[in-house]
Amino acid sequence: MVPAPHTQHSPSSTMLNSSSTTAHAAPSTNGDVHAPKDHHLSSPSDTVSAPVNRKKQKRRQKQAARLAERQLANGHVSTDDTTQNGSSHANPERYHSDDGGADGPDHEQPTNGDVYDKDGQDSMDAHVDSQNPQGPNGTESSQKSTGRKSKKKKGKKARNNSHAQGDETSTPMSTPSVSMSHPLPPPLPSHLASHNILKPAKNRSIWNTSTQEERENIKTFWLELGEEERRQLVKVEKDAVLKKMKEQQRHSCSCTVCGRKRTAIEEELEVLYDAYYEELEQYANHNQGSFEKGSPMVPPPRLYQPPLRSPGQHTRTQGQFHPSRGRIHELTEEDDDLEEDYDEEEDDGDEPYSDEELDEEDEETRAARADFFAFGNSLTVKVADDLLKNDGKHFIDMMEQLAERRMQREEDTQYGIAAAHESLHSGHNHGPFDDEDYDDEEDEDYDSQEEEDYEEDEMDAMTEEQRMEEGRRMFQIFAARMFEQRVLTAYREKVAEQRQQKLIEELMEEETRNEQRNAKKAREAQKRKDKKRLQKQAKEEERARREAEKAAEEAAAKAEQEKKLEEQRKKREEQRKKKEAERKAQEEERARKEAEKLRRQREERERQAEAERKQREEKKRREEARRKEKEERELREKKAKEERDRKAQEEQAKKDTAKGGEEAKDQEKRDDQAKRSSQQGPVPIPSNLHHLQGFSPAVAHSPHVPSATPVLPKAPTPARPRQPSQQDSHSSSPHSQAPSTDPSQASLSPRSMPVSQSSGVASGNSQQGHGLHAMLHQPQPSTPLSPLGRSIPPGFSSVNGIPPNPPGLSGMVARPPVGHDLPSYPPHSGPFISPFRGYPAPSGIPAPPGINGARPMPPGRGFPLEPGQGFAFHGQQIPGAFSTPQGGLPHRHSRQPSGSLERSPLENHAQPMPISRPSPIKRPSSTQQDQQKGGDRTTQRDVDDLSAHLGSSALLDDTDVPLSSTLSQSLPGATAPGTFPGPARASFGGPSLFPDPLSASKHANFAVSPAVSGGTWGAQIPFGTSAFPSAQTWGTGHASGWSNNAFGSGGHHRAHTSRPVAIRLLVIQACKQLNTMSPFKGADGYHDVNLVLRQVEQLRPQNEPSISLKEMLDICDTEGNTQNGGGTFSIKKDETREFVKFEPDNNSAASGHRGSIVPGEIGSPVPSSSLPAFGGIGTPSVLRQYSSPPMGF
């Protein structure tokens, strides 16, 4: 193919073609680019034509285009070619119209960063088409433009973010040039460049250059670039394209074929870019001329061409540089098709090419087959636009095709044109994206083209040289498109730098002008200030003169006023001094009175302290006297105890000697009896028999195991009269009594009870006697004890002799014995103490009257097993563990002779005996020597225990009388001689029938029996003596009479609320009651001692002796503890009276707690009855509240 003479354009014409590019290269101020609306477009009513078949129309147009190309190829050039050749820049009115469009009210500002709007492209297309109304296809130009406009309007809604509508949309690879190091500003919009054209010539500068000047500037910029800078631009472009290709092929396969293909692509790209740079260099060095071989090169990279607003416009301007090809109108139509393709591609969001677009591409490619340059031009534009949009798939496909052709040419040159063409489709292609593979679309295009005969003819006519030329032109077009952006970018950088420098200079000039202007204003303001200052100074002087005159007048008036004030001040000072003297005199008088008052108070406190000191001294003297007396008594008691121990040992030795011989004879009988007792168990014997034999001193207190001899009746021996001294000695020591019998004992024989009981009596007695010894083996206090707190003396008859059913009170029975080995719970209480709290002792104390028919409690049980209805006990008398010989009954201290020992009529009824618990078998002492050895070891301990129990009462002379103050001289548990031991809690009879003394046991829930409480010093009141006149004398009261209380025998140990403690508790209660009684309240809680004494007398039990005032005051001096109620008493005296006040402390709070202790807890009292206490009827609550556990065991 021989080029036409005017194929290569001169630089000047190229410069003219690039005016629009230069106009649009100015930077935008805000990043948004404005596109002018075209006012030359005809209205829709003018341009709308009848709808036609688009495909057929395109086919007809392309057929006409091919005919025109053949005519042009034959040398027939249309006269409109030259006109069309310069249509893009030969009409200056177009820019004015654009400017007018920009100034119009419909001026748009897209916000998506697009440089040009589609309306601007329509305007350009309309101008280009209107320039050639007489071309070969001139009759259809208006219809085509109208169709294009309608299609563009239809697809414009989806093209807000399109970058393919112009070549200035964005810079695809913003690689800085060698001359600039900062990023480029965006290109200047077309309407801003159009504004610059309308500026006057005198205002033209770097900010507003004309199109011609812009062209000259771009030309000068390109020519001024050195060889190295130009090569650097090409190198940057080549590196960017290689990098993009590598990114696109990163996910392709790694087979050998693909690897060779990639290598071939890189090599082909190197070769193409090197050849392209040589052509560029040649073009820059030789501004005009033609290349020596082949068809003419595509002009340099459209450096000075008009702006490519769309791929269509780019194609059209490229076609204008080859007028010999005759592609002017045909390319315009193809541009429209490509625009439609882009519009529809953008409308289709999910797939890159729609079916309609593929159909249009089929027609396009069929037309392009007739002209390879047109095909390459169209494809290259699209590939370049895709690469500008960061989508290099089409470019890579194009390069792969070139590489495949090269490899195919090297490997298989013998197949010629057909094989070369086949290599386009049979290559081992692995596109990076399966859904958007361009080769598949191209294959479809080629398949559809091959269906047409005339396309197949042209394909067969292609040669390898033409294919290579086609690929070369395609790459040149692509490289020109891309390189154009690089050159424009470099130029824009330079222009932006110049404008930036110019802007800085203008800003500096403006700042200088502002400074000068401000300086001038400051000078003028200073002048005005000076003028005002002078005027103000004159006014100040005038005002100062007037103020001086006024001050002089005021000073004279002030002096006169001060003189008057001074006189008034002197008068006030004199009055103040006078008042101060009077006030001081009053304060001195008040201070004197206060000092006198303090002195009197101090003297009063001193007198009170002296009185308290004297009281304490007196109290110390009394305590010292008591202590000495106590020591003397203890000394006497110790001597008497030693004497008694000596006598008891002698007597015990005699008894053991006599008894040892008898035991040796009856050894075999004792063994048999022991066996029978282990098999059958001991059968309780009548209580009278226990009275006779069960509690002899030798058996009860002998430390040896007695032999189990049968109880046989002895000959009656007349009882010899007992002397008072003997009675005293016997009552204080059980060892001193001889095992004598009463005449009444001789009448009792084993026939009055079952024969089987005789064997259990001795065994039971021996075990109980051993248990008593174990209990007595405890340290005892050496303080004198009242007889009420002692154990039953040996001379008593058995406690079991108390009738179980007093007259009118039937069905009462005591609890059976608890076994042979007595516990040691209260060790001092002997066999009369119950080992379980809340139940009667094994001594057979009957139950209270009115609770009938209840069964006896089995041993070891805390409650009755099967109580009858209504708490009825069986009317059976359980014999005690042991009994006391009747002859050993202690008498009154006044040596009253012993009374009758006959049985009480209350005991005459039959007493069935339940079988008691069997005793364990023990080996009796075989010889008298063994018994004597055991007696020697324990004699001394027994004597000590007895002396501790009996205290110093054994030392009393015949004429001695106990102290009158019973409570003040006794320890807890003591009772006064001549008083009636009564219940501490549950006396239903009240004080009139059964008085409740202060010394009564607080744990005796029912009555305290004379046999149990040990009150032997006074005449014991038998049941019926005071309340029942028909009762017998006291002599029979121990054996058969009912107790002196309403509910029989109760407390088994001594009471433990002494008289001082009781009186102190009464005083505390009286003070508390007076505090709560408003009429008797004293000042600050103090009460008159006489009033307190009257209140105490009201609270005192009737059977207690009266309390004197001195005794009460002495007790108030004692310190409080947990036993006596705690707290302290404050005594205050005045001229005539004494006052007392009780102040509680922490020990006082213990009273409420002790009242809430239930039986069974630590510190709780030991109840003496099997029935619960009935709440202390008739007993002061203060005694129940502040009573303590037994002391001095």
UniProtKB/Swiss-Prot annotation:
Key words, A-Z: Coiled coil, Cytoplasm, Stress response
Chain spans, region Disordered: 1-197, 288-368, 422-468, 508-815, 857-942, 966-988, 1145-1193
UniProt biased composition (Polar residues): 76-90, 129-140, 312-321, 741-769, 1182-1193
Gene Ontology CC terms, in alphabetical order? cytoplasm
Q: What gene codes for this chain?
A: nst1
Query: Acidic residues: which segments have biased composition?
Result: 332-364, 434-463
- Main location, first listed in the record: cytoplasm
User: Is the Transcription keyword given for this protein?
Assistant: no
Q: Where is the composition biased (Basic residues)?
A: 53-63, 146-160
Q: What is this protein called?
A: Stress response protein nst1
Similarity remark: Belongs to the NST1 family.
